[in-house]
């Protein structure tokens, strides 16, 4: 079949771009079409690590999984990870090139675009189809110059575009018509149709609006996708604080602080979905409830998030929590916070060299931030649970060392999957068994590790839960719903005709 590309753009952030690309990846994969996801530029604190040690956006990793592929760095060549209100770490083809403010990155875009086009071309040469996800909205007037995330990229590679809008938020017709009107004539010409996402109710009541939209714009509505109750795929944007499963009789109550620069919040998705666990996410100025287990998550700016936690009363809470027998897990940045000292000699986090922050002091450890980031997938066994497999990935700039090597027990024994005799000790467990620290993101995803950690936290004979299996079923549910409400074969033909 002729090769083609298709770009999904949205009227707003969170319109459904990522989910539609995920659904189409699975549907093309089912048809035997070799398909790859691609997002030229992504801004997110929730990232993934490829097998060869590169960093990409979480959504592209999920889309690759839907397409039956291992995630590759070319699927997301530009990743921006905000570390201040006005700046971000810029990652090009999997490696950090530095911190930039908005003005600095705007000037850098011409270089970044070359990398994006280079990565796209490699995928286009390798796969029959490339499904491209835009970012935010293509109609942001102030961002149109040097755009490499939406229409600027579509124009560069000459591909068709679908615009998707979320009707659940209201104003869907204004969003679609307004977005189209703000595009240039050549950009409007490459829009092959609209998709309306998350519709609830009787579609016959929507038909008059759909007819008006098609007459007003000259563009077809390619599909109206229904709201999927209870649907969950890991998010890479803001943390959703609302529950993602129905209330249950929890055997374990977990509390997690949401910090200004919380990263990799998918770490606790498996916990939020587990039938015996209640997870409470605590934001600014909120009362911290009692808990059996506290998880300190990862952070893109550990020093400032550490100061935030102190300001919010978490230090006193943790001391009291541990005094009365509670458990604590620190993951990556949260692990560093549990130590004694955090040193930033190069000013990597706040542009001020030789800064030093005092940690909570629960682990005899100090961390020095280094310029080179550790990026790798990991596997092995939990050191405290016989035969419990653990998988995960590391994304961190800090190098930690224990200040007191006596009575150090490690969290896991990690290997390369080939030679287990050369296992590497990772993480920390306190002598009283109340505190765990680890650099492993995704530590709860493997069913063995999840069950063992729940047992450690106080759940007797915790129920098994396989997060990867759950995710695969959700992708299939999404794909089935999309297949029922869009003509996928006609869409493929439309894309092929556009690029002939």
From Swiss-Prot:
UniProtKB keywords: Cobalamin biosynthesis, Glutamine amidotransferase
Record domain GATase cobBQ-type: where: 251-449
Transmembrane segments: none
Domain of life: Bacteria
The keyword Repeat is annotated on this UniProt entry: no
Pathway per the UniProt entry: Cofactor biosynthesis; adenosylcobalamin biosynthesis
Active site as annotated: 332, 441
InterPro entries listed in its UniProt record: Class_I_gatase-like, CobQ/CobB/MinD/ParA_Nub-bd_dom, CobQ_GATase1, CobQ_N, CobQ_synth, GATase_3, P-loop_NTPase
Pfam families in the record: CbiA, GATase_3
BP terms from Gene Ontology: cobalamin biosynthetic process
Annotated SUPFAM superfamilies: Class I glutamine amidotransferase-like, P-loop containing nucleoside triphosphate hydrolases
Gene Ontology molecular functions: ABC-type vitamin B12 transporter activity; catalytic activity
Family: Belongs to the CobB/CobQ family. CobQ subfamily.
Protein's job: Catalyzes amidations at positions B, D, E, and G on adenosylcobyrinic A,C-diamide. NH(2) groups are provided by glutamine, and one molecule of ATP is hydrogenolyzed for each amidation.
HAMAP family registered for this protein in UniProt: CobQ
NCBIfam families: cobQ, PRK00784.1
Name this protein carries in UniProt: Cobyric acid synthase
